[in-house]
C-alpha cells in the first residue's frame, strides 16, 4: 500500500511535463529574443551594413537560452524511469519550470534590449558597451534558472 502512495502510475507525468516545459518555454524565449533583435538588425543594416556582424551578439545570446532548456530537458528525460517517485517527479517539474520560465523572461529581455541597443548603436557607437552589459545581465536571468534547475534535478 505504501508503494502505491509513493509511486502512483501518474507520477512520471510530472517528470515528462518538467522536461517539456524546460524545452518549450526556453525555446519560446529564445525565439522571441532572436526575432525581436533580428528585426532590429534588419532595420539597422539598411543604413549601416558594416555593423551587421557586430550587431549579431543579441541573436547569439538569445540562442544560448534555448541551450539551457535543452540541457535540463535532456537531464530530466534521461532520469525518467518506470518506478519514479512522486517526490522525484515533482522535483523534475520544478526544474523544468525553473529553467523554462526564467529562459522565457531572459529571452524577452534580450530581445527588447537587443532591438533597442542595435538601433541605438547604429546612431551612436558608444552605446555598444552599454548594450553588451545590459545583455549580460539579461542572460544571467536565464543562467539563474539553469542553476536552480540543476540543483533540483540532481537532488
Swiss-Prot record:
Residues 34-55, 115-131 are cytoplasmic. It is found in: Cytoplasmic vesicle, Clathrin-coated vesicle membrane; Cytoplasmic vesicle, Secretory vesicle, Synaptic vesicle membrane. The keyword Ion transport applies. Expressed in brain (at protein level). One of its GO terms (biological process) is positive regulation of Wnt signaling pathway. The record marks 139 as: Essential for proton translocation. Gene3D superfamilies: lithium bound rotor ring of v- atpase. GO terms for molecular function: proton-transporting ATPase activity, rotational mechanism; ubiquitin protein ligase binding. The chain crosses the membrane at residues 11-33, 56-76, 93-114, 132-152. Its main location: membrane. It is a multi-pass membrane protein. Coiled coil: none annotated. It holds the Pfam family ATP-synt_C. Ubiquitinated by RNF182, leading to its degradation via the ubiquitin-proteasome pathway. Keywords: Cytoplasmic vesicle, Hydrogen ion transport, Ion transport, Membrane, Synapse, Transmembrane, Transmembrane helix, Transport, Ubl conjugation. One of its GO terms (cellular component) is synaptic vesicle. SUPFAM superfamilies: F1F0 ATP synthase subunit C. Residues 1-10, 77-92, 153-155 are lumenal. NCBIfam families: V_ATP_synt_C. Belongs to the V-ATPase proteolipid subunit family. Proton-conducting pore forming subunit of the V0 complex of vacuolar(H+)-ATPase (V-ATPase), a multisubunit enzyme composed of a peripheral complex (V1) that hydrolyzes ATP and a membrane integral complex (V0) that translocates protons. V-ATPase is responsible for acidifying and maintaining the pH of intracellular compartments and in some cell types, is targeted to the plasma membrane, where it is responsible for acidifying the extracellular environment. V-ATPase is a heteromultimeric enzyme made up of two complexes: the ATP-hydrolytic V1 complex and the proton translocation V0 complex. The V1 complex consists of three catalytic AB heterodimers that form a heterohexamer, three peripheral stalks each consisting of EG heterodimers, one central rotor including subunits D and F, and the regulatory subunits C and H. The proton translocation complex V0 consists of the proton transport subunit a, a ring of proteolipid subunits c9c'', rotary subunit d, subunits e and f, and the accessory subunits ATP6AP1/Ac45 and ATP6AP2/PRR. This is V-type proton ATPase 16 kDa proteolipid subunit c. It comes from Rattus norvegicus. The gene is Atp6v0c.
